[in-house]
Amino acid sequence: MIKTVEEYALKKTLANSPNGRNTKFLQASFSLWTRFKNFQKNPPYALYEDDEMKSIIFATISKKSKYVNLYEICTVQGQEGKGYASKIWSEFIAICFEKKMERIKLSCTPSSITWHLRNGLVFWAVDRQGSLRSDQPLMKTREEQKELREKAIYEPQLVLPSKKVCEKLIQEALETQPLSQKQSINTYNAIQQVGKYWLRNYLKNGL
């Protein structure tokens, strides 16, 4: 079961979490949400099992633009490798679909590409941190998202963003970003891994 989580509850989970990479990641996400005062406007969603928080999604939902902007997915330290990130993703997109959201966008780090490919994402550009930008219509399930992606390989107009978004994404090329040599190599390898789901060449069709 997933539900929105208040700031104090997440702070308590952080206080009780052992030191580790996931705890640092969750702390950074918590700080970001606090800094932008998003706990009031867009509270995170948390997956619970046996009344224990397992994973958390930080995202904004815009009724005006009909966009879901997903910032981070965090698994609580010690709960890795149990499928909690996939569970919260599936439940979260279903909730957003029921809220009449129409598109979802996010930036995917090179290290997360393998996991995100299982979510049915397509990719268009590279941000300043070397992450791959993803933006597509929101479907209710991962399977429907993957079905749409397969169709988009032959009909890219099915997933193209608006003209304004396409113009912005065209400017975000790997070659133009201020990345270190190591970052550039990691991002290049991620693009190769994405393969046919790297749809950058079709952005001009949206102009």
Summary of predicted features, one role per range:
Residues 98-101, 109-133:
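Conserved active-site alpha-helix within GNAT-family acetyltransferase domains
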Residues 109, 129-207:
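C-terminal "cap" of GNAT-fold acetyltransferases
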Residues 28-50, 55-67, 71-74:
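A conserved beta-strand-loop-helix scaffold within acyl/acetyltransferase catalytic domains
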Residues 81-94:
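Conserved acetyl-CoA-binding loop-helix of GNAT-fold acetyltransferases
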Residues 1-35, 168-172, 183:
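Short amphipathic alpha-helix that is part of the acyltransferase structural core
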Residues 70, 103-108:
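Conserved hydrophobic beta-strand within the GNAT/NAT acetyltransferase core sheet
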